[in-house]
Each structure stands twice: as structure tokens, then as C-alpha cells.
């Protein structure tokens, strides 16, 4: 064997032997802080216009890299607070509003400002129809 080859084999052997399995200490992981959501209180006549106002800001937050998920969570909280009341009065409108709330989250997660604009337009029309019939 040539000296260069012997040295290469020796270095390869030493580096291979020095490899060890990697272990991860999972006891160090931090637990996420618990989150609590307090549902807004009020009637549908009060909270639904707030829902539309929140939806109006979603598109600009998606474009401007703002806290779009916070807006979505407020929209969802407002809807959760009044969905039973709206469903009791008009099940079809409640289904449509609920679907638009879901579409709002999808628009935010997928960064689609045009979809957020459509959600805002649809929610505006649906809330206007609900308030006119209430």
C-alpha cells in the first residue's frame, strides 16, 4: 500500500469510528402558553357590523404583511358569539355567513387578498340582508 493511501484509510477509519448517534433531550422543550378567548357579548345587530368592519381590513393586512390571523380570530370570535342567534332567525343566512368566515381564514392563510375582498363584499351583503329581515 502506498503511504498516501494508507493515510487516507487511517483518517477515514478514525472519522467513521468517532461518529456517534445524535440524541435529543426532550425534557428541555418549552410548553406553549395557554391561550384563552373571551367571546364578545352583544346581539347580532351589534356584533355583525363589527364582523364586517374586521373583514374590511383583512385584504390590506394580507398585502401589507400585517397580523391577518389576529383579524381572522376576531372575526371567528364575533361569529361564534352570534351564530346561534342568527341560526335561530335564518338558518340559510347563518350557513352562508359561516361559510364566508371560513373563506376569510383560507384567504389569510393562503395570502389571497382578492379572496379576502370577496369575503368582505359577501359578508357586507349577507349582514345587510340579515339586519333588514331582523
Residue ranges and their predicted role:
Residues 19-23:
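Bacterial signal peptide processing site
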Residues 76-100:
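Short, solvent-exposed, charged loop/turn and helix-capping segments
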Residues 1-17:
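Sec-dependent bacterial lipoprotein signal peptides
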Residues 44-48, 94-97, 105, 111:
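Selective transmembrane helix interface/packing segments
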Residues 54-61, 108-134:
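C-terminal amphipathic alpha-helix
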Residues 69-74, 94-99, 117-122:
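Short, charged, amphipathic alpha-helical segments
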Residues 24-69:
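Immediate post-signal-peptide N-terminus of mature secreted/exported proteins
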Amino acid at each position: 500500500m502506498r503511504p498516501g493511501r494508507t493515510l487516507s484509510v487511517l483518517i477515514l477509519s478514525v472519522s467513521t469510528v468517532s461518529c456517534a448517534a445524535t440524541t435529543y433531550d426532550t425534557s428541555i422543550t418549552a410548553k406553549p402558553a395557554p391561550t384563552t378567548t373571551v367571546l364578545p357579548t352583544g346581539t347580532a345587530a351589534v356584533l355583525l357590523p363589527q364582523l364586517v368592519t374586521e373583514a374590511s381590513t383583512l385584504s390590506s393586512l394580507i398585502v401589507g404583511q400585517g397580523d391577518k390571523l389576529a383579524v381572522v380570530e376576531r372575526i371567528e370570535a364575533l361569529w361564534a358569539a352570534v351564530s346561534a342567534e342568527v341560526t335561530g332567525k335564518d338558518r340559510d343566512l347563518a350557513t352562508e355567513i359561516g361559510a364566508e368566515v371560513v373563506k376569510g381564514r383560507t384567504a389569510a392563510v393562503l395570502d389571497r387578498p382578492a379572496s379576502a375582498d370577496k369575503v368582505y363584499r359577501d359578508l357586507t351583503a349577507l349582514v345587510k340582508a340579515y339586519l333588514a329581515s331582523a
